[in-house]
């Protein structure tokens, strides 16, 4: 019998993407509530408790409510795509390539917190350097990023695509999170193994899908002897043996005139780059991904497949 999957919130941006990815699969059975019954709490609870895996695509508070509905039913495993449980010690963090054993933790977990899009890129760049001892305690990390507007969900999609929207956004590029309290900062801090919160400056561009995350570093404030080459080697070693995260060679990176934010749109992979000029004291680390792919729905399906492989 095929395992039953229920996407709670299947009509939102992330839920729709997950459902589209699974539309042609015959190895799972998708449970669904008719859109007209979305607010039928009894039907929703029944669906949650009938699933082998429930994928929650809900706001934080609604996700917490859904988890309570299945907490006593050990037959139901959960993937949550909100920020509610991403730093919770009892939840596996759903970035399978983060460490060599992370995929195994996801496979055996009952509860998996799907990573945020920005933290996926930031953690991929920062954690290997912390693990290798290159990025010292107390380093003032800065993370700059630009995302496709689909990361803002249905509301922002309407604002960006409908000029008649009462709160239409016409800017081709804009900063937000200006008070430096973005909800992804705790996630970056925890899973980046940082002892102080990074400064995070997010922005949105007038393109639907895609993302660039940047972490600039001063070499003379890193561990003694740190170079562009040693940083690149740390990334290569950390992500060796898998095919989702690609560390682009220094030679290939040097030949690039620009980075295209939408290059990986529609894909579930991620590319990492190390930029700089040999002999100087600065480097810029860059992650390239699809905010709805490896940054959201693609990761959720990957985590589901790992859990089903147990």
From Swiss-Prot:
* Enzyme Commission code(s) on record: 1.2.1.38
Where does it live in the cell? Cytoplasm
The record's InterPro entries line, in alphabetical order, gives: AGPR_AS, AGPR_type-2, NAD(P)-bd_dom_sf, NAGSA_dehydrogenase, Semialdehyde_DH_NAD-bd
GO function terms (MF aspect): N-acetyl-gamma-glutamyl-phosphate reductase activity; NAD binding
Listed Pfam families = Semialdhyde_dh, Semialdhyde_dhC_1
Q: What is this protein called?
A: N-acetyl-gamma-glutamyl-phosphate reductase
**What does the entry list under GO cellular component?**
cytoplasm
To which pathway does this protein belong?
Amino-acid biosynthesis; L-arginine biosynthesis; N(2)-acetyl-L-ornithine from L-glutamate: step 3/4
Q: Which UniProt keywords apply?
A: Amino-acid biosynthesis, Arginine biosynthesis, Cytoplasm, NADP, Oxidoreductase
Which GO biological-process labels does this protein carry? L-arginine biosynthetic process
**Lineage, uppermost ranks:** Bacteria, Pseudomonadati, Pseudomonadota, Alphaproteobacteria, Hyphomicrobiales
**Which CDD domains does the annotation name?**
AGPR_2_C, AGPR_2_N
Tell me, in a sentence or two, what this protein's role is: Catalyzes the NADPH-dependent reduction of N-acetyl-5-glutamyl phosphate to yield N-acetyl-L-glutamate 5-semialdehyde.
Q: Record's HAMAP family?
A: ArgC_type2
Principal location listed in the UniProt entry? cytoplasm
What reaction gets catalysed by this protein?
N-acetyl-L-glutamate 5-semialdehyde + phosphate + NADP(+) = N-acetyl-L-glutamyl 5-phosphate + NADPH + H(+)
Q: Which Gene3D superfamilies match?
A: Dihydrodipicolinate Reductase, domain 2 (3.30.360.10), NAD(P)-binding Rossmann-like Domain (3.40.50.720)
